[in-house]
């Protein structure tokens, strides 16, 4: 299993995590059976965020997440929770427009809006196999790390909606 994921260009840590997921799926059912290719593909992948002004960094995260499993679920911060997290002048785009933009990517299977500051309640309800977050997080700090495997997406650029808005306001 490990070699399968490593050959798919996953880093060694993520390859180990996914191989572990596959072997866990195999032994959860009583009796002996061969590991099948479907055992290697986690069913539910979860990521969350504000996704205020959808940019290339968001799209890279969504594409990466979608490749990991069969179903990609996005937890989307409500307008109210976004204001608390990002400031009174946020979100820039309404919840309706943010949902529309995420749907138009054709990468997301389901979108759930959550009103809380963290998506823990939603994660407990969904019970995803894997939670994907940006590499600016540490594994132990990711909400839901006791519920699902965590994979950190390596950000290659420092693009963020906050930086985009600051640049716009500066000009």
Where are these regions (language model features)?
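Conserved post-catalytic alpha-helical subdomain immediately downstream of the catalytic base
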Residues: 1-36
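Nucleotidyltransferase catalytic core that binds NTPs
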Residues: 13, 37-171
